[in-house]
Amino acid sequence: MRESSQIRETTETKIKLSLQLDEGKNVSVQTGVGFFDHMLTLFARHGRFGLQVEAEGDVFVDAHHTVEDVGIVLGNCLKEALQNKEGINRYGSAYVPMDESLGFVAIDISGRSYIVFQGELTNPKLGDFDTELTEEFFRAVAHTANITLHARILYGSNTHHKIEALFKAFGRALREAVERNAHITGVNSTKGML
């Protein structure tokens, strides 16, 4: 089974995270940031991933360190769980509607970290979650997992719905990208490596 568990401890956060790419039944998320817990749970459920997250952070300051560090550990776990990347689709994309909002995510498990994030988040805060942390989370995942990630909010008026559409699209796009494909021998690259 493709899986990884990691712990990251700094003076600002303590993150314990486990990711299972092939087993999506066990999802448990506790970061101390309610809206972020909800988004990570949606990502895992819609991607059919197992995900267990326990995070303690300096949320008395704000949620920035917690959200970013969870993204770093998730990216590291993804990179480790993918092993040599043989036989996977490599690419994945998904459009996800959430009522009036439409989100899109495209992923290339390329070995090159890059992110494009487009979207207007008009409400600056949802509960204790600063909405600008949405981009910070995706940036941290893309950087540490060495993937190319494009995330775009095409339209919408409700900030909660916009972010929810992105996290669901992220799960669905990543599921497609990591899926094993019987028609692919080795890695899906003319270079012979990713």
Swiss-Prot record:
HAMAP family: HisB. It catalyses: D-erythro-1-(imidazol-4-yl)glycerol 3-phosphate = 3-(imidazol-4-yl)-2-oxopropyl phosphate + H2O. InterPro entries: IGPD_sf, ImidazoleglycerolP_deHydtase, ImidazoleglycerP_deHydtase_CS, Ribosomal_Su5_D2-typ_SF. Pfam families: IGPD (PF00475). One of its GO terms (cellular component) is cytoplasm. It comes from Bacillus thuringiensis (strain Al Hakam). Its main location: cytoplasm. Pathway: Amino-acid biosynthesis; L-histidine biosynthesis; L-histidine from 5-phospho-alpha-D-ribose 1-diphosphate: step 6/9. This is Imidazoleglycerol-phosphate dehydratase. It is found in: Cytoplasm. Its EC number is 4.2.1.19. GO terms for molecular function: imidazoleglycerol-phosphate dehydratase activity. The lineage of its organism: Bacteria, Bacillati, Bacillota, Bacilli, Bacillales. It is an enzyme of class 4 (lyase).
